[in-house]
């Protein structure tokens, strides 16, 4: 199979959103929610051409009559039947390609169980008949997309946050740390503190509104206590937001109180350390000789790192934790929401990468376990 003449497909399956497109492109063509919906009551829509399942935006818009499921929890696939439906939807409805004609690069969470990598490999080759396949760790791809091969990546999406130190292109597994605190939790927390102000959001539809408020209005304070004090004395930080029904609500210190839990997860009832302390803890778990390069290359990736002010705050907190003479540098590329996908697009289009693919022939000879020998 000669991969030169046909574009590879790159699919980044996140807990919240699936990003998919063609290698060599600078952004994913398709971005849709990683959800599968099934009708709550069989036969309720007879004669309406009812399908037995819906994926992505269509599932989201029909959620009133469906039971919604997220097949990826905290970055790890937990429901393979639903996952298969998401891949099917990606190929046939979103990208409109025949999977048997394109090499496919998938992404995986750090520390993804071995059995999961094998299952992924098996489904792609046996169900979708892909000619070639590869799987890459998400954080490593983010690092590549920033033009580096050594650094420490803070990757925070909708379902999970990982801190992954990488040296010369290889992740250092003993120092990878995971925090089960990400975008979904921030949305929940924002719902909670808005209800204290008298605005109640409870349904899934209202949850989407709060997610939008979070994405449009929230920011990270450089000095939280100072910001609280300032906001109590002036209305300068207050913003208004128009709800779909035309009602206008005002949001004040909630704008920075919600993302603050990334640094202090206490209010969520989590014992976990914040993203700053966790990044530091991961660096400390690495060999003393590589720490300087890690401190100087802290790369942020994922949608939950998109808050204004987050890089400056991170710089301040890590500098306070690091040895005094250490140069700390935070890299927060503007396209970091999609940097995992972009890294995959870069990798899969490199001429030097073409011999790295697992071919259908190799799979037929060795079976799913070949993924451990070829993808690391």
From Swiss-Prot:
Family membership: Belongs to the actin family.
Protein name stated in the entry: Actin
Keywords of the record: ATP-binding, Cytoplasm, Cytoskeleton, Hydrolase, Nucleotide-binding
Record's keyword annotation contains Cytoplasm: yes
One Pfam family it belongs to: Actin
Functional description taken from the UniProt entry: Actins are highly conserved proteins that are involved in various types of cell motility and are ubiquitously expressed in all eukaryotic cells.
Family annotation (InterPro entries): Actin (IPR004000), Actin/actin-like_CS (IPR020902), Actin_CS (IPR004001), ATPase_NBD (IPR043129)
